[in-house]
Amino acid sequence: MSSNSGDVRLWGGRFADGPAEALAKLSASVHFDWRLAPYDIAGSRAHARVLHAAGLLTEDELTRMIAGLDRLEADVADGSFTGTIADEDVHTALERGLLERLGPDLGGKLRAGRSRNDQVATLFRMYLRDHARTVGSLIADLQDALVGLAEAHPDVAMPGRTHLQHAQPVLFAHHVLAHAQALGRDAERLRQWDARTAVSPYGSGALAGSSLGLDPEAVARDLGFEHGSVGNSIDGTASRDFVAEFAFITAMIGVNVSRIAEEIIIWNTKEFSFVTLHDAFSTGSSIMPQKKNPDIAELARGKSGRLIGNLTGLMATLKALPLAYNRDLQEDKEPVFDSIDQLEVLLPAFTGMMATLTVHRERMEELAPAGFSLATDIAEWLVKQGVPFRVAHEVAGECVKVAEADGKELDELTDEQFAKISEHLTPEVRTVLNVPGALASRDGRGGTAPSAVAVQLAEVKADVAAQHAWADAKK
């Protein structure tokens, strides 16, 4: 069924000879654009209907055309029909398949009023919109895992860091919800991108539109484009900003996941011992029997570079292309296909790693006040006593200097040492030199107080539920 029955190129009438073998190999894209076949067939059904509405197909011809497309779709799905290098691309392969099933007299009528230029621009949008929902669902799953960690450890304190140095104590739940919120913005970008992409280029033809009286709005409705057809046929066939934007979103997802990954790698070291990875989501060493390696996190970190590279390569391809369609745009698909493939493998594994993480409360809380991380609390306590912050900052810094010289933490300084540093440092300063007090005091919106984190948790859960609903809407 997949053998090539003659020359079914979609062009060639003005050429005396066929393309050179080297050109055919260079031009071939069916090995990577075959994944668009179901969308191409859906587009062909919609196109057949508007041909019928325009009087270019009879009722009987439409019925037989749809039946032939249905048979072709089934054969593609079960693998009995595939493209070959001689087909050049998915569009040519499927036209060959239709001609084999319907013959040239009927099968050949489907080409009227459309070009590969508007076909591929439409099919690519359909494909990416479907996978945007798949990726969006996987992001929501990862957010669910982070929410689960926050709910399981609502009162665990840990050292918050800036520049990877101890800064201020924070709740572990506060920390993981920060990652959940970043991923939520990625999910929001997908939803916003989908709304912008819900416009059909079908009917644009090669660039100038169609003279056959076809209805592009009917095709748009048939194919699920909520915002109808494009307003400019040249823009419809030539623009790939929707591809570049999608590639950026996937790269941003990779970057955000890589930030979590880097922390897991650090936290999993013996020196930190904040977390332990589940055996099912770790690997060993071929020579060192004691090793338990965070390969998922490391692969996430590495794949983020790959996703960024796909975006960069795509942008370089699109740069300075004149209107309208150019063959350079054949190169727009593989980078984005790869980004989708990578995320759809990476995100489930990463979610599994996070969902099965063991958190070591004692170790986190041991280090939460370390590194003089309560110094800011001293300064803010002084401000509440009426001391200007500039002075309070200097006094708190002096406390750190004295404690560091004595090999102590701030809460280990004596009342006499505090009094010697500043007359404002009365024994009451000790009320803020503890982690629970430091956490509870930061109760403004977005803060690390348990009450503030509870609000964040509820908001993230609501956002994740909305994301799941959007992702599942077209399944």
UniProtKB/Swiss-Prot annotation:
What is the catalytic activity of this protein? 2-(N(omega)-L-arginino)succinate = fumarate + L-arginine
List the GO biological process terms: arginine biosynthetic process via ornithine; L-arginine biosynthetic process
Q: Which InterPro entries match?
A: Arg_succ_lyase_C, Argininosuccinate_lyase, Fumarase/histidase_N, Fumarate_lyase_CS, Fumarate_lyase_fam, Fumarate_lyase_N, L-Aspartase-like
Task: Report the EC code(s) recorded for this entry.
Answer: 4.3.2.1
Annotated localization: Cytoplasm
Q: Which UniProt keywords apply?
A: Amino-acid biosynthesis, Arginine biosynthesis, Cytoplasm, Lyase
What's an example of a GO molecular-function annotation for this chain? argininosuccinate lyase activity
Which SUPFAM superfamilies does the annotation name? L-aspartase-like (SSF48557)
- Where is it found, in Gene Ontology cellular component terms? cytosol
Pathway listed for it?
Amino-acid biosynthesis; L-arginine biosynthesis; L-arginine from L-ornithine and carbamoyl phosphate: step 3/3
What family is this?
A: Belongs to the lyase 1 family. Argininosuccinate lyase subfamily.
* HAMAP family for the chain: Arg_succ_lyase
Stored PANTHER family: ARGININOSUCCINATE LYASE
* The protein, known as: Argininosuccinate lyase
Q: What is the lineage of its organism?
A: Bacteria, Bacillati, Actinomycetota, Actinomycetes, Kitasatosporales
